[in-house]
From Swiss-Prot:
Belongs to the TRAFAC class OBG-HflX-like GTPase superfamily. OBG GTPase family. GTP binds at residues 11-18, 83-87. It comes from Schizosaccharomyces pombe (strain 972 / ATCC 24843). GO terms for molecular function: ATP binding; ATP hydrolysis activity; GTP binding. This is Uncharacterized GTP-binding protein C428.15.
Length: 409
């Protein structure tokens, strides 16, 4: 993949984006270590949860990741998050922090659009009642496509002249324009292949250009729609409306403020709570647990939270946000090990120390390049030798040992 995955978080003011980021970056699995050299001011480290390979072999108690953590076979993998500021209608025209918003956006591999599904804030984040949050989803897409489309149309006559003069193919011509938005030749080729255009590039009209731009945005910026504030009484009707309009595979229901509240109580010793769980244990549930007694006010708040969120949806949904982003990016974990028999680097270090995320379709040879920076002499999996051209398959060829080539004298 060449570089670390970056997930951009967007959302209008008061959507709960900051609360969502706080919940994702305050995971108890955080150790202070992460495999990134520098973290810029508008970036943070979040933790995506996956099923760890240790659970397949009953080694949960011996799993000690170098980065993130693992608890009961659920592994937390650090991922870089980007706080994309300045989202208001008209951002593509420079309104608000529009220029910065769009410049930040181009670095992201995927987006999480945090939407206030309660309908209690308008397009600019001002308090109101009865606002339709599906409008926010539509205008974010329009802002991004307008930004890229306007830039492309402005240069189109020159693009066409150069395309004809150099006898370039459409992929190369478009890639020279889309590269500024973080595209690769493979992404640009995928855009054109998916549209099956018969018309030569030099004869494209505005409608064709719009189709190309829309498809580029769909492929380059896969977007999770995080419907936040599901704890609000007005949320249900809006969720139903959005579910009828949007691809359900992009939707995640969440209550970021509930997640932050529960984690804070857990840290303070009032409750036992694990991220992503529907269960909240208190002193009343386990008198010998050592938990602190709750005030009547806190008991009421927890009961309301359980009724509105946990019992209805199975969790606060926050942990599902990054999991959905990984799904849209087609990411799967690979576990490089020094020993495919005991999965440890040394007797005292624990098992499955390393884990990397790769795209579905990645080969063992490509993983070797990522891990070693070069080719391995041989690649060994749990079930024997693995060929360089063998595609990584979760549960079969995702635990790998790379035997190094000996340096030439």
């Amino acid at each position: 993949m060449g570089r670390d995955i970056l997930i951009g978080f967007v959302g209008k003011p008061s959507s709960g984006k900051s609360t969502m980021l706080n919940a994702l970056t305050d995971a108890t699995a955080k150790t202070g270590n992460f495999p990134f050299t520098t973290i810029e001011p508008n970036r943070a480290i979040g933790y995506a949860q996956i099923e760890c390979a240790c659970s397949r072999f009953g080694l949960q108690d011996k799993c000690k990741p170098i980065y993130g953590g693992c608890k009961n076979g659920v592994r937390s993998i650090p991922i870089q998050l980007l706080d994309v500021a300045g989202l208001i209608p008209g951002a593509h025209a420079g309104k608000g922090l529009g220029n910065k918003f769009l410049d930040d956006l181009r670095h992201a591999d995927a987006l999480v659009h945090v939407v206030d599904v309660s309908g209690t804030t308008d397009a600019e984040g001002k308090v109101c009642r009865g606002y339709d949050p599906s409008v926010d989803i539509a205008w974010l897409y329009k802002e991004i496509t307008a930004w890229i489309g306007n830039n492309l149309r402005e240069k189109w006559p020159n693009i066409v002249r150069r395309h004809i003069a150099t006898k370039a193919n459409p992929v190369n011509t478009l890639q020279s324009q889309f590269s500024g938005y973080g595209s690769t030749p493979a992404v640009t080729a995928k855009v054109l292949d998916s549209l099956h255009l018969d018309t030569p590039l030099e004869k494209w009209d505005d409608d064709t250009i719009e189709k190309v731009v829309n498809r580029f945005v769909d492929i380059k910026f896969p977007t999770v729609i995080a419907l936040n504030k599901i704890d609000h009484p007005d949320a249900d009707a809006n969720i139903s409306k959005i579910a009828r309009k949007e691809d359900p595979n992009r939707l995640v229901l969440a209550s970021a403020i509930s997640e932050v509240f529960l984690r804070r109580l857990a840290k303070q010793g009032f409750v036992k709570y694990e991220e992503g769980s529907e269960f909240v244990d208190t002193l009343d549930d386990f008198p010998d647990s050592g938990l602190k007694p709750l005030s009547e006010n806190l008991k009421t708040r927890i009961a309301d939270l359980q009724d509105m969120v946990l019992f209805r949806h199975g969790s606060t949904g926050v942990c599902n946000v990054l999991a959905k982003a990984m799904e849209l990016l087609n990411l799967i974990p690979v576990f490089p090990v020094k020993n495919v028999h005991n999965f440890a680097n040394s007797p005292n270090e624990g098992v499955f120390r390393d884990c990397i995320l790769v795209k579905q379709g990645t080969t063992a040879g490509q993983v070797s390049q990522m891990v070693l920076g070069g080719e391995a002499m041989s690649i060994v999996g749990v079930n024997g030798n693995v060929g360089e051209s063998d595609v990584i398959v979760p549960g079969k060829t995702d635990i790998l040992h790379f035997r190094l080539r000996k340096a030439e004298a």
